[in-house]
Design a protein with these regions (language model features):
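GST-like domain detector, emphasizing the conserved glutathione-binding G-site
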Residues: 1-125, 139, 146-148, 219
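Acidic/proline-rich low-complexity IDRs
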Residues: 2-4, 190, 212
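A generic structural-conservation signal
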Residues: 30, 151, 201-202
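GST-like fold's C-terminal all-alpha helical module
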Residues: 98-194
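A late-sequence structural motif
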Residues: 195-196, 200
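Acidic/histidine-enriched, glycine/proline-rich intrinsically disordered or flexible terminal extensions
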Residues: 205-220
Length: 220
């Protein structure tokens, strides 16, 4: 069975799933799908028009965590969710914190940080407080021993390595303050960047980002 991962490699959520597939050694294809497209069939595959989504023999699956859980269930080799229910729950917990309480909060700043827009001072102030709160909570949960959940690479690392560098970058750009500065991010990113799978994902991300920038300049 071959899965098709749909979306674009500049998306951190797309790369979370791509890294999972590469780490597990699962054969898959990629289909370039941009968000914001008017393609009528897109909502049949991803009802909100979001990426990533998976095309499977049974049908499409949207939302990255649903995709990740499906992959773990269908392909048990090289498990990225522990078999122990508590340990697996702790990995899921870390993913939720890195996404819901960090990346999605920082996303409020993306219009100004990356897209030439402007974010209100009120939004910046509120976002900073939420980020500080989220980072403090995340720090209580994470291990960095040397991986996010402990000595083994897990799905939490697939999420962390695509989300946390963005949170760090955006906070420095908007506030001049890295909200993750008290975490051992430099060592962690260095460790992760030694993995061939992460190198591959990063190379594709850079190429996709350049393609996006070129497309946006063409529209102007």
């Amino acid at each position: 069975m071959t899965l098709k991962l749909c979306g674009f490699a500049a998306s951190n959520y797309y790369n979370k799933i791509k890294l999972q597939l590469l780490e597990k050694g699962v054969a898959f294809e990629e289909e370039l799908v941009w968000t914001g497209t008017s393609e009528a069939t897109l909502v049949d595959r991803s009802p909100l028009g979001k990426v990533p989504f998976l095309d499977t023999p049974q049908g499409p699956i949207s939302e990255s965590m649903a995709c990740a859980e499906y992959i773990e269930d269908i392909f048990p080799q090289n498990r990225l969710l522990p078999e122990d229910p508590y340990a697996a729950a702790k990995v899921r917990e870390l993913i939720i914190y890195s996404e819901l309480h960090l990346e999605l909060v920082a996303r409020q700043l993306y219009p100004e940080a990356f897209f030439g827009g402007k974010v209100s001072d009120g939004t910046k102030e509120r976002t900073y407080k939420l980020l500080r709160k989220g980072v403090a909570a995340f720090a209580r949960l994470t291990r960095f021993a040397p991986f996010i959940a402990g000595p083994q690479f897990t799905l939490a690392d697939c999420a962390a390595i695509v989300h946390l560098p963005l949170v760090s970058m955006v906070s420095k750009m908007i506030y001049g303050d890295d909200v993750l500065a008290e975490l051992p991010m430099k060592d962690y990113i260095g460790l992760m960047n030694e993995r061939a799978t992460v190198k591959s994902v990063n190379a594709d991300r850079k190429a996709s980002t350049e393609l996006m920038l070129a497309a946006s300049l063409t529209k102007k």
